[in-house]
């Protein structure tokens, strides 16, 4: 429309007289209350509502930044995307929604058979939304494969004499200026007392070495969050991603922080950086533009933020 054309000319023309004409025209339209004409309605040019940090980080550490383990990697990858998710934005991909469903089914299942787990999935399938019947049929095939892979993993752990000591375990503790709170998918203990913390993912692949979520779970062990569940003496074997989205299940483990001092220092440094960033000490959240911005099946869909303030189709 006219407003869009004038706004585009205002920011693109190099001719000073044309810029002035566009500015005057927009001013007249703004006086007439035409939508989008007034600068107050232009995205990206308003000042901060407040320059204050979300959480004041006092020297006595009374100000605590609440951190959820599952959110730290998201913050590292793109602070702006994390901020949107933390304040109402959600990931609507099938993998994310089915992952939530599968976690609940696994928590409630009395046995680890395929029949039992798939029955649980079917009982909750109606909570998922699909755009078309063919889309639903495709996702059913994917879901069945994920359940099959999950059963394969559970059978493998049983053969290795690992037992489940906790599922959806609440962790809630202070770590410096951070208050850590979340739930751990699985806590398993091996025949020699070794404890493995497991995070179930519906992806086909994932890196574990510097995964901050796994690192925080290990720090939770070191802060005695699982003492009531595990048998003593116990050692921390590490934390692992359980990936069920591929042709077969796979695991990717992070080495024990109790045995890798360098990795432990790295994880604590990541948390310190997240504390400063999540509390908005610098009053901004950086947008790290990348492929995740426009991939609805990947990290998230932020394509709306990539749309220029003034667009024109002529």
Residue ranges and their predicted role:
Residues 1-314:
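RecB-family 4Fe-4S metal-dependent nuclease core
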């Amino acid at each position: 429309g006219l407003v869009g054309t004038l706004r585009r000319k205002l920011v693109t023309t190099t001719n000073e007289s044309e810029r002035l004409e566009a500015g005057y025209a927009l001013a007249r339209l703004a006086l007439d209350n035409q939508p989008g004409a007034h600068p107050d309605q232009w995205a990206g040019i308003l000042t901060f509502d407040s320059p204050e940090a979300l959480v004041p980080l006092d020297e006595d550490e009374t100000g605590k930044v609440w951190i959820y383990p599952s959110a730290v990697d998201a913050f590292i990858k793109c602070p702006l995307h994390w901020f949107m998710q933390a304040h109402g934005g959600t990931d609507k991909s099938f993998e994310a929604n089915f992952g939530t469903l599968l976690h609940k089914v696994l928590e409630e299942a009395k046995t680890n058979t395929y029949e039992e787990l798939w029955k649980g999935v079917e009982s909750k399938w109606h909570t998922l939304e699909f755009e078309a019947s063919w889309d639903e049929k495709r996702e059913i095939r994917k879901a069945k494969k994920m359940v099959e892979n999950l059963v394969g993993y559970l059978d493998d752990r049983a053969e290795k004499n690992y037992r489940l000591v906790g599922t959806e375990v609440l962790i809630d503790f202070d770590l410096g200026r951070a208050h850590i709170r979340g739930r751990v998918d699985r806590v398993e203990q091996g025949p020699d007392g070794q404890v493995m913390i497991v995070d179930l993912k519906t992806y086909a692949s994932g890196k574990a070495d510097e995964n901050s979520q796994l690192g925080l779970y290990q720090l939770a062990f070191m802060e005695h969050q699982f003492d009531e569940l595990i048998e003593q003496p116990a050692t921390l074997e590490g934390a692992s991603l359980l990936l069920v989205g591929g042709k077969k299940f796979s695991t990717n483990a992070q080495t024990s922080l109790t045995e890798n001092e360098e990795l432990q220092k790295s994880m604590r440094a990541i948390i310190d950086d997240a504390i400063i960033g999540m509390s908005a000490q610098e009053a901004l959240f950086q947008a790290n533009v990348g492929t995740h911005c426009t991939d609805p099946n990947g990290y998230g869909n932020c394509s709306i933020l990539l749309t220029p303030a003034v667009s024109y189709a002529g």
